[in-house]
UniProtKB/Swiss-Prot annotation:
Gene from which the chain derives: VEL2
Disulfide bonds: none
The protein's assembly and partners: Component of the heterotrimeric velvet complex composed of LAE1, VEL1 and VEL2; VEL1A acting as a bridging protein between LAE1 and VEL2. Forms a heterodimeric complex with VOS1; the formation of the VEL2-VOS1 complex is light-dependent.
Name of the protein in question: Velvet complex subunit 2
Location in or out of the cell: Nucleus; Cytoplasm
Main location: nucleus
All residue ranges annotated as the Velvet domain in the record: 32-341
Lineage top rank: taxon: Eukaryota
InterPro entries in the record: Velvet, Velvet_dom, Velvet_dom_sf
Family of the protein in this entry: Belongs to the velvet family. VelB subfamily.
Pfam families per the UniProt record, alphabetical: Velvet (PF11754)
Biological processes per GO annotation: sporulation resulting in formation of a cellular spore
Amino acid sequence: MAASMAHYQGHLSNRITTGRAETVGQAQYPPRRAERKYKLEVEQQPIRARMCGFGDKDRRPITPPPCIRLVVLDEMDRELDFNEIDSTYFVLMVDLWNESGQSAVNLVRHSSAAPTVSISSSTTTSYPPPPERSHYVATTIPGYDAHSQAYRHQQHQHQHQHQHMQPQPMAAAGYGPGAHTGVAVPPYYPPTPQPPTPTYQQYPAPAPAAPYGQAPAPSAMIPATPMSSNHTRNLIGMNAVNACRLNDTKNKPGFWFVLQDLSVRTEGTFRLKLFLFDIGAGDGTNATVAADGPTRGKGKCLAVNFSDPFTVYSAKKFPGVIESTPLSKCFAQQGIKIPIRKDGPKLPNQAEYDADD
């Protein structure tokens, strides 16, 4: 009994002096997130692309498609086996940066001269508001009831255009052929009670008429048009991708991020900035994710890296897409949607046809 007690005390003293008083056998479990290191290795760098312009459906993918391998290291800087990693909630985010990697160039000013017209502004332009007519008559004919005339104008707005050209009853009564030589005052019309608003009146109601002798306010004559932003995204396509479990050209399995659907609107030299996020909740293995899926809060950025500079050409200067690489063909055979150039004799402008595929 005494011998076994001494053996236990010696074993306990050894664990305390070596600093390993935690759970025995912890090394057999995956290390915690704080003890892991994550790296993004760009195994296939982007080289060139043709600018896609500002069309909504025009896409000119970057060639070759960037392929990024996820590397996870333990506390001893040893690469972990992919079987020990759950990449379910690992997400790669991509931004577009300048050649020097000093500033982001995700937004670009739209170069089109035609402004984008919203629905409200186009409706106002297609159907001129009644205040223009009422203000014009109110400032030229004294004693005229602008409110009643504006209502009559709205009431007959759906009739034929030749009915609008007929003289109004007031003009026929008070302004005959020789009326312009005198200072005759038109007869007084009693105010007409306002009926309920017609159901077809879906446009802004007429503004109140300005008093006689005063010019109407500019805001009453010309409806304000909201200013729309003329900036748009410079990098378009899938800029957030999940990790895929793929085998490389040496048949080595691993986790890869393939960016086969990225296009740039403008020409120039750029870099891709890559961010690795873990949107799961747990110890880095994503084994204790909540039942409702990924976290609703903030996701931790685990790694950041840049690609090599690549050039985006205009349509006239574009030398053609890059030949399909062995890595692209390898991933395409495993189900990744990468456009692969067909082998065989090349026809004139074959590069353009392949780029449109």
